[in-house]
Amino acid sequence: MSTGLTAKTGVEHFGTVGVAMVTPFTESGDLDVAAGREIAAHLVDNGVDALILAGTTGESPTVTTAEKLTLLKAVREEVGDRAKLIAGAGTNNTRSSVELAEAFAEVGADGLLVVTPYYSKPSQEGLVRHFTEIAQATDLPICLYDIPGRSGIPIESDTIRRLSELPTILAMKDAKGDVVAAAPLIEETGLAWYSGDDPLNLVWLALGGSGFISVIGHAAPNALRELYTSFEEGDLARAREINATLSPLVAAQGRLGGVSMAKAALRLQGINVGDPRLPIVAPNEQELEDLRADMKKAGVL
């Protein structure tokens, strides 16, 4: 389905149906590399063409740099070049982000996801300088990550325009949801624009977005691939039907939070990825039963 919008070269680097993959842990709370391989293979076998590691859903604040690098190397060995591996290199410390970006480049990441610096609330000029230093640290393509609900500040439109002029900044993960502001930016900047909030997946496609970086995709990778394909083939009715079918998963994510929902959903589907690390906690028994019911409604259990 042609949108008539500017071609987005970032798609070739960041894929179309991405999942912000959980980081699996053993019962003792250590990194579970074998489970990481299993999750990655499962997702890629079922239509996912980009895995985002060490992001929000990957519990990046509580995962060490060594663990992040170990997981990325293991996933690369497991899926090869069947999916793009995008590494979360954003922190609220520019120097640390640069070091992390360089480390991910050395172990074979295909691209970087760089979130807005959180907690410190820098100015827009500070954001430009922060992202620019990271972009200059490696040759890897970069996807900006705008999520003011967690970072405390938005990446404003003029800042996005400035950053889009940098040669390696090719994409945006939008978890801000300001579709009025974003619609012209998709055209003006040529950035590949990704839904970073599952309730808006179909909306972003309609506005010229390039795909998804999803949480509910853990439970429904095939359905997300079909949603994307149906839209691209012009079957809007089918895309809307799939989107509606997935709404119970969206509701569950809203109740439980992305990490807890995704890990519990995988466990219910037979893939044990362990509990989250504190301060995030697993669902209680009632919450788990409610999730089970939602997954059955969505046809994924």
UniProtKB/Swiss-Prot annotation:
Compartments where found: Cytoplasm
Keyword list, A-Z: Amino-acid biosynthesis, Cytoplasm, Diaminopimelate biosynthesis, Lyase, Lysine biosynthesis, Schiff base
SUPFAM superfamilies in UniProt: Aldolase (SSF51569)
Active site residues per record: 145, 173
Positions bound to pyruvate: 57, 213
Domain of life: Bacteria
Alphabetized GO MF terms: 4-hydroxy-tetrahydrodipicolinate synthase activity
Amino-acid biosynthesis listed as a keyword: yes
Main localization of the protein described in the UniProt heading: cytoplasm
Reactions catalysed according to its record: L-aspartate 4-semialdehyde + pyruvate = (2S,4S)-4-hydroxy-2,3,4,5-tetrahydrodipicolinate + H2O + H(+)
Pfam families according to UniProt: DHDPS
InterPro entries assigned: Aldolase_TIM (IPR013785), DapA (IPR005263), DapA-like (IPR002220), Schiff_base-form_aldolases_AS (IPR020625), Schiff_base-form_aldolases_CS (IPR020624)
Record site feature (Part of a proton relay during catalysis), residues: 56, 119
EC number, UniProt record: 4.3.3.7
Pathway in which this enzyme or protein is active: Amino-acid biosynthesis; L-lysine biosynthesis via DAP pathway; (S)-tetrahydrodipicolinate from L-aspartate: step 3/4
PROSITE patterns: DHDPS_1, DHDPS_2
GO CC field: cytosol
Any GO BP annotation: lysine biosynthetic process via diaminopimelate
Family: Belongs to the DapA family.
Assembly, per entry: Homotetramer; dimer of dimers.
PANTHER family associated with the record: 4-HYDROXY-2-OXOGLUTARATE ALDOLASE, MITOCHONDRIAL, DIHYDRODIPICOLINATE SYNTHASE
Role summary: Catalyzes the condensation of (S)-aspartate-beta-semialdehyde [(S)-ASA] and pyruvate to 4-hydroxy-tetrahydrodipicolinate (HTPA).
Protein name: 4-hydroxy-tetrahydrodipicolinate synthase
Protein's organism: Corynebacterium efficiens (strain DSM 44549 / YS-314 / AJ 12310 / JCM 11189 / NBRC 100395)
